[in-house]
């Protein structure tokens, strides 16, 4: 956990999206603190292994965010397990997690596994549809989910996921002020350095994903925006 607490900026790579070797090198050598491999659909064991092998040419830490049990493979530094707190489907609250432990319990290195308390806040994103997330939540609802993540479940990470939409900075601030030990991850709609810097004022870790595939050079600038010129 010690290394994860130092992460300020993370790039998320989707195994189901194309990225050239040159582009991948720019991402991995950008100064970002880590790479998370994960996606909502089209994630297979084959494309996860392929992307892992390509990322492993670089020294940047690499985590797999598990969305499909069949795509789990050894070789990552960390394994992030999303638990969607505002899902109406038990699959994303406990069933998948139970099945994963049933299949791989004897093989799991628990020091490498971290559960993320997810709160999906964009009703139009694929993740909300897939997980049957209740996205018409109030500010009080989100803060309650954050408190549950920290004080009831003792999750190391609370993840505010806007997935393609730039989120509510004021709400991110309020959630951050609520949390004491659990780290606040923010992801969604960051396409410019200015947006990244704004969210980094409150989020412990800013996750940049889609921008890699829409405007790579702008995405690369988010590293310095979050971490400063030493990145």
From Swiss-Prot:
Sn-glycerol 1-phosphate binds at residues 12, 159-164, 189, 209-210. One of its GO terms (molecular function) is magnesium ion binding. Its cofactor is Mg(2+). Keywords: Lipid biosynthesis, Lipid metabolism, Magnesium, Metal-binding, Phospholipid biosynthesis, Phospholipid metabolism, Transferase. Mg(2+) binds at residues 14, 40. Its EC number is 2.5.1.n9. One of its GO terms (biological process) is glycerophospholipid biosynthetic process. It is an enzyme of class 2 (transferase). The keyword Lipid biosynthesis applies. InterPro entries: GGGP/HepGP_synthase_I (IPR039074), GGGP/HepGP_synthase_sf (IPR038597), GGGP_HepGP_synthase (IPR008205). SUPFAM superfamilies: FMN-linked oxidoreductases. Belongs to the GGGP/HepGP synthase family. Group I subfamily. Prenyltransferase that catalyzes in vivo the transfer of the heptaprenyl moiety of heptaprenyl pyrophosphate (HepPP; 35 carbon atoms) to the C3 hydroxyl of sn-glycerol-1-phosphate (G1P), producing heptaprenylglyceryl phosphate (HepGP). This reaction is an ether-bond-formation step in the biosynthesis of archaea-type G1P-based membrane lipids found in Bacillales. Homodimer. This is Heptaprenylglyceryl phosphate synthase. It comes from Anoxybacillus flavithermus (strain DSM 21510 / WK1). The lineage of its organism: Bacteria, Bacillati, Bacillota, Bacilli, Bacillales.
């Amino acid at each position: 956990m010690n290394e994860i607490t130092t992460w300020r900026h993370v790039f998320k790579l989707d195994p189901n999206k194309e990225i050239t070797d040159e582009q991948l090198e720019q991402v991995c050598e950008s100064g970002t603190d880590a790479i998370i491999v994960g996606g909502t659909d089209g994630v297979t064991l084959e494309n996860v292994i392929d992307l892992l092998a390509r990322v492993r040419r670089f020294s940047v830490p690499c985590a797999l965010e598990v969305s499909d049990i069949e795509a789990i493979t050894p070789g990552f530094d960390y394994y992030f397990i999303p638990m969607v707190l505002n899902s109406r489907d038990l699959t994303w609250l406990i069933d998948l997690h139970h099945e994963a432990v049933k299949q791989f319990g004897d093989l799991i290195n628990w020091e490498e596994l971290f559960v993320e308390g997810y709160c999906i806040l964009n009703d139009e994103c694929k993740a909300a549809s897939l997980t049957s997330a209740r996205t018409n939540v109030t500010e009080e609802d989100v803060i309650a989910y954050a408190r549950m993540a920290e004080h009831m479940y003792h999750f190391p990470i609370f993840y505010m996921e806007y997935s393609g939409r730039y989120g509510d900075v004021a709400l991110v601030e309020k959630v951050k002020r609520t949390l004491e030990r659990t780290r606040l991850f923010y992801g969604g709609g960051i396409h410019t350095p200015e947006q990244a810097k704004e969210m980094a004022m409150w989020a412990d870790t800013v996750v940049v994903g889609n921008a890699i595939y829409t405007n790579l050079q702008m995405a690369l600038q988010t590293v310095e925006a979050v971490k400063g010129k030493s990145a």
